[in-house]
Amino acid sequence: MADFLGMMKQAAQLQSKMKEMQSELDRIEVEGISGGGLVNVRMSAKMEVRAVKIDPSLLNPDEVGVLEDLLVSALADAHRKAEAAMQDKMKTLTGGLSLPPGLGL
């Protein structure tokens, strides 16, 4: 019975730490950049896009495809950085064990 109570206490502590981690991840922001800075995407470590900046020189109706490609690239860059930030924070929670890719909070 004592083992069960100990496990329940550990589960409650882990749940509390996870809530704290969610809050921390919401405060962490990363920036994805493409086109040498022509497109910037700011994203939280919870993968929420916060802002998109597009250089006005890209707003040419004849080159929509270029803008689309740069936007996809900037989003992918931000996503990679956010995933790395989340993994770093999770290592502190899990005592150094890393989570498999894609297994976020």
UniProtKB/Swiss-Prot annotation:
The keyword DNA-binding applies. Belongs to the YbaB/EbfC family. Keywords: Cytoplasm, DNA-binding. The keyword DNA-binding applies. One of its GO terms (cellular component) is bacterial nucleoid. Transmembrane segments: none annotated. One of its GO terms (molecular function) is DNA binding. This is Nucleoid-associated protein RPE_4812. PANTHER family: NUCLEOID-ASSOCIATED PROTEIN YBAB. Gene3D superfamilies: Nucleoid-associated protein YbaB-like domain. Binds to DNA and alters its conformation. May be involved in regulation of gene expression, nucleoid organization and DNA protection. Pfam families: YbaB_DNA_bd. It is found in: Cytoplasm, Nucleoid. Homodimer. InterPro entries: YbaB-like_sf (IPR036894), YbaB/EbfC (IPR004401).
